[in-house]
Curated annotation (Swiss-Prot):
<dbReference type="Pfam" id="PF04815">
    <property type="entry name" value="Sec23_helical"/>
</dbReference>
<keyword id="KW-0862">Zinc</keyword>
<feature type="modified residue" description="N-acetylthreonine">
    <location>
        <position position="2"/>
    </location>
</feature>
<dbReference type="GO" id="GO:0012507">
    <property type="term" value="C:ER to Golgi transport vesicle membrane"/>
</dbReference>
<dbReference type="Pfam" id="PF04811">
    <property type="entry name" value="Sec23_trunk"/>
</dbReference>
<comment type="function">
    <text>Component of the coat protein complex II (COPII) which promotes the formation of transport vesicles from the endoplasmic reticulum (ER). The coat has two main functions, the physical deformation of the endoplasmic reticulum membrane into vesicles and the selection of cargo molecules for their transport to the Golgi complex. Required for the translocation of insulin-induced glucose transporter SLC2A4/GLUT4 to the cell membrane.</text>
</comment>
<keyword id="KW-0256">Endoplasmic reticulum</keyword>
<dbReference type="InterPro" id="IPR006896">
    <property type="entry name" value="Sec23/24_trunk_dom"/>
</dbReference>
<dbReference type="InterPro" id="IPR036175">
    <property type="entry name" value="Sec23/24_helical_dom_sf"/>
</dbReference>
<dbReference type="GO" id="GO:0008270">
    <property type="term" value="F:zinc ion binding"/>
</dbReference>
<dbReference type="Pfam" id="PF08033">
    <property type="entry name" value="Sec23_BS"/>
</dbReference>
<dbReference type="InterPro" id="IPR029006">
    <property type="entry name" value="ADF-H/Gelsolin-like_dom_sf"/>
</dbReference>
<feature type="binding site">
    <location>
        <position position="66"/>
    </location>
    <ligand>
        <name>Zn(2+)</name>
    </ligand>
</feature>
<dbReference type="InterPro" id="IPR037364">
    <property type="entry name" value="Sec23"/>
</dbReference>
<dbReference type="GO" id="GO:0070971">
    <property type="term" value="C:endoplasmic reticulum exit site"/>
</dbReference>
<keyword id="KW-0653">Protein transport</keyword>
<dbReference type="GO" id="GO:0005789">
    <property type="term" value="C:endoplasmic reticulum membrane"/>
</dbReference>
Length: 765
């Protein structure tokens, strides 16, 4: 008999799905009392090396309001060649190509191990991938030089048929013609005036022919012809490499005490318009590189006077940030236009000060693009991260999908409340759409323009079955996820995942439901909900909401005697959940103090798209200890783990930190590691460095690497994350002998848990 933990892990590996509850309450009323909604973390392109795509198209249910895909949950009559849809119970005839099927000769999509299956759509033209580079030239020469080298490197990684384009900007915006032999030719636009797609089309003389051809369908086998601004790599590789090499810093003089005039808003608008006119609904990536904030034209985020700093959270709270609303509105409009045509927007921002990610965040957030933040383009952090964008799978194809749509079908007892993640609504109202919206709701279809193997959406459901309509014994609720996307090879593909879970009556079988709780998935699903709310609500209100939900969950599933906090017990399936909430409350996702608006936007962007494992690390970092007393071991994220004779390695997802305890740091300063008789000390120092390198080499985006020691200024990164079980207030308590006191007034996990138990068992609650 598999345990729930094994069941959860198998489902994640096979289908890329993690549910908050793996047995569902059978009525609407009982489901609302569960506190945590029935919800799933779904990774549409979860890597499955053992799942080769099938070279035929899926069989669909014939009922027009259903159109579910044939799957292992359907009942099949092999003699009559009929199958019954498990969602609407419609009986369907198999197509003629299935004439040879039998119990012994089943098609792959009916086998239980293929609850997830990928089909290749063979009709229609194969489209080339498109990469449009949009480059800020208002930066220091060494930064620009490093960026040019990174872009030249990326050209060598693109498939020869990929189309590329180049737009550069500073005070003006230049759209470069790439078809010219021997001469550099570009169209120059003022950086203060926005242009519509129609105006751009007329000014650049873009033909409308490709647009109409591309949408006409299967009879046009040729891909739309390239134009002067977007050319195949194989044709202009040398020209573009030279052109990038010749790029100069923006020539306009910058007076003393002023910022350079930077037209990021117009440059991105022209990039979106160019692709809109020429290649709608084709996989395309706008890669925007910025070295500072937009200081003129639509989308500007700060004036050009250096004495006026860019907005802080304090300015925004006090309504003292005059460009935020207007700038955000401009970029939101561009993000929605790009999402409508299926194009991805990446933003690579490298500067010591803020660059305006707060206003621009919707561009990558709504289109599934990447957001990368660094100090300079001339750092390994940017160079390595950018190189990883072009990582290939074992078949030599990019690990990226384009122009995706996700459609969800549900059995009649359950409806879809909404999704939170890098997607936009396709406003497809169907019978399985709930009226209660969570996140992006009111639809059963979403557009995900950019997909990677780790892109993960949080999907929230509502049980709608009435209390007085019991579900038959052994009944199961089913959900089907249908993801259509353009593979990086140019093929259209459809990945179908169909899952089912048992129903249980919450009044008589509450133990079954409680035992099926996935506390890790639930923590991430509730965290996404909290961060989604934090975008529009006051910080303290979100924390209060999170606390209320946690108290209610403890009251519902804890075991206790009324008004006796010491009697409170949580079963193993719930025991880690309060700890996750404690760390979430203290995290940079909900606490903006000490973070700039750009940093908060960056952290939230990554949390809203990463898979469960990475998201858990972001909420509760992992801490490993290295010492002479044994092999490396995971230790509690607690101040008591900081010992003088230990080295700690902390992984927060965004940072990899190595901390040397006081004694170790003194030995290192004395140079013991260089003496042959202390070789074991040299090995001890090297062990965490080797482990850190392993993480640094594989993660996207590459984390910041910090090497620090007891008393070092960067030790603050560790001290701010650990649970402050010892502080300056209790460090002299009797019997206290280990660990480092933290100078903070934050409550510790122990105090948090004591308060939680007190509130959960209170009869006044």
């Amino acid at each position: 008999m598999t345990t729930y933990l094994e069941f959860i892990q198998q489902n994640e590996e096979r289908d890329g799905v993690r549910f908050s509850w793996n047995v569902w309450p059978s009525s609407r009323l009982e489901a609302t009392r569960m506190v945590v909604p029935v919800a799933a973390l779904f990774t549409p392109l979860k890597e499955r090396p053992d799942l080769p795509p099938i070279q035929y198209e899926p069989v669909l249910c014939s009922r027009t309001t259903c159109r579910a895909v044939l799957n292992p949950l359907c009942q099949v009559d092999y003699r009559a060649k009929l199958w019954a849809c498990n969602f609407c119970y419609q009986r369907n005839q198999f197509p003629p190509s299935y004439a040879g099927i039998s119990e012994l000769n089943q098609p792959a999509e009916l086998l239980p191990q293929f609850s997830s299956i990928e089909y290749v759509v063979l009709r229609g033209p194969q489209m080339p991938l498109i990469f449009l580079y949009v480059v800020d030239t208002c930066m220091e020469d060494e930064d620009l030089q490093a960026l040019k080298e990174s872009m030249q490197m990326s050209l060598s990684l693109l498939p020869p048929t990929a189309l590329v384009g180049l737009i550069t900007f500073g005070r003006m915006v230049q759209v470069h013609e790439l078809g010219c032999e021997g001469i550099s030719k570009s169209y120059v636009f003022r950086g203060t005036k926005d242009l519509s797609a129609k105006q751009l089309q007329e000014m650049l003389g873009l033909s409308k022919v490709p647009l109409t051809q591309a949408t006409r369908g299967p009879q046009v086998q040729q891909p739309p012809p390239s134009n002067r601004f977007l050319q195949p790599v194989q044709k202009i590789d040398m020209n573009l490499t030279d052109l990038l090499g010749e790029l100069q810093r923006d020539p306009w003089p910058v007076p003393q005490g002023k910022r350079p005039l930077r037209s990021s808003g117009v440059a991105l608008s022209i990039a979106v318009g160019l692709l809109e006119c020429t290649f709608p609904n084709t996989g395309a990536r706008i890669m925007m590189f910025i070295g500072g904030p937009a200081t003129q034209g639509p989308g500007m985020v700060v004036g050009d006077e250096l004495k006026t700093p860019i907005r802080s959270w304090h300015d925004i709270d006090k309504d003292n940030a005059k460009y935020v609303k207007k700038g955000t509105k401009h970029f939101e409009a561009l993000a929605n236009r790009a999402a409508t045509t299926g194009h991805v927007i990446d933003i690579y921002a490298c500067a010591l000060d803020q660059t305006g990610l707060l206003e621009m965040k919707c561009c990558p957030n709504l289109t599934g693009g990447y957001m990368v933040m660094g100090d300079s383009f001339n750092t390994s952090l940017f160079k390595q991260t950018f190189q990883r964008v072009f990582t290939k799978d074992m078949h030599g194809q990019f690990k990226m999908g384009f122009g995706g749509t996700l459609e969800i079908k549900t059995s009649r007892e359950i409806k879809i409340s909404g999704a939170i993640g890098p997607c936009v609504s396709l406003n497809s109202k169907g019978p399985c759409v709930s009226e209660n919206e969570i996140g992006t709701g009111g639809t059963c279809q979403w557009k995900i323009c950019g997909l990677s193997p780790t892109t993960t959406l949080a999907i929230y459901f509502e049980v709608v079955n009435q209390h007085n309509a019991p579900i038959p014994q052994g009944g199961r609720g089913a959900i089907q996820f249908v993801t259509q996307y353009q593979h990086s090879s140019g093929q259209r593909r459809i990945r179908v995942t169909t899952i089912a879970r048992n129903w249980a009556d919450a009044q008589t079988q509450i133990q079954n439901i409680a035992a099926s709780f996935d506390q890790e998935a639930a923590a991430i699903l509730m965290a996404r909900l909290a961060i989604y709310r934090a975008e529009t609500e006051e910080g303290p209100d979100v924390l209060r909401w999170l606390d209320r939900q946690l108290i209610r969950l403890c009251q519902k599933f804890g075991e206790y005697h009324k008004d006796d906090p010491s009697s409170f017990r949580f079963s193993e399936t719930f025991s880690l959940y309060p700890q996750f909430m404690f760390h979430l409350r203290r995290s940079s996702f909900l606490q903006v103090f000490n973070n700039s608006p750009d940093e908060s936007s960056y952290y939230r962007h990554h949390f809203m798209r990463q898979d469960l494992t990475q998201s858990l690390i972001m909420i509760q970092p992992i801490l490993y200890a290295y010492s002479f007393s044994g092999p490396p071991e995971p230790v509690l994220l607690d101040s008591s783990s900081i010992l003088a004779d230990r080295i700690l390695l902390m992984d927060t997802f965004f940072q990899i930190l190595i901390y040397h305890g006081e004694t170790i740091a003194q030995w290192r300063k004395s140079g013991y590691q260089d003496m042959p008789e202390y070789e074991n000390f040299r090995h001890l120092l090297q062990a965490p460095v080797d482990d850190a390198q392993e993480i640094l080499h594989s993660r996207f985006p590459m984390p910041r690497y910090i090497d620090t020691e007891h008393g070092g200024s960067q030790a603050r990164f560790l001290l701010s994350k650990v649970n402050p079980s010892q502080t300056h207030n209790n460090m002299y308590a009797w019997g206290q002998e280990s660990g480092a006191p933290i100078l903070t007034d934050d409550v510790s996990l122990q105090v948090f848990m004591d308060h939680l138990k007190k509130l959960a068992v209170s009869s006044a609650a």
